[in-house]
Amino acid sequence: MICCDKVLSSVQSMPVIDKCSVTKCLQTAKQAAVLALSLFAVFASGSLSILSAAVLFSGTAAVLPYLLILTTALLGFVCAVIVLLRNLSAVVQSCKKRSPEEIEGAARPSDQQESGGRLSEESASPQASPTSSTFGLESALRSIGDSVSGAFDDINKDNSRSRSHSF
């Protein structure tokens, strides 16, 4: 999030952008979204497993539907845990690959000077105020929305091409 905050603050104040690239920010935002969705899937499928097992073992309902629900929920739970663990390990590996200089540079961007201009004060302390952290979250959500919108645009283009070729 610090990366996205630095890039967008730099673009607004018009100096040269730091070493963070927009693709790194998009990758971080996508990883965060996948982590959040897989965590939600783990909780949802786990709770569905518990509820269906409780109904199944209480003996008050038909066995087959709840048995199917239980097996499907358990399969979803296992898959969601696998996805969650893979993404967590990817995030940990990307954090380990970052050098200490990059981490310090991200923590203290006011020390860096490029092309004679200093970065703006709001990017110099990205954690100083709640508005800067909100700005980072807003930019991450905006990039996710742009990615989803671009994907839907591509799907619509493909659908329109296939319709025009089918006639």
UniProtKB/Swiss-Prot annotation:
Its main location: secreted. The chain crosses the membrane at residues 37-57, 63-83. A motif (Phosphorylation-dependent binding motif) lies at residues 161-166. The modification Phosphoserine is found at residue 166. It is a multi-pass membrane protein. One of its GO terms (cellular component) is pathogen-containing vacuole membrane. The record marks 166 as: Interacts with 14-3-3 beta. It is found in: Secreted; Host vacuole, Host pathogen-containing vacuole, Host pathogen-containing vacuole membrane. Residues 122-134 have a biased composition (Low complexity). Keywords: Host membrane, Membrane, Phosphoprotein, Secreted, Transmembrane, Transmembrane helix, Virulence. It comes from the Bacteria. The keyword Secreted applies. Residues 97-136, 148-167 are annotated as: Disordered. Phosphorylated by chlamydial kinase Pnk1. Inclusion membrane protein probably involved in early modification events of the chlamydial inclusion. Binds to the host cell 14-3-3 beta (YWHAB); phosphorylation of Ser-166 is probably required. This is Inclusion membrane protein G. It comes from Chlamydia trachomatis serovar D (strain ATCC VR-885 / DSM 19411 / UW-3/Cx). The lineage of its organism: Bacteria, Pseudomonadati, Chlamydiota, Chlamydiia, Chlamydiales.
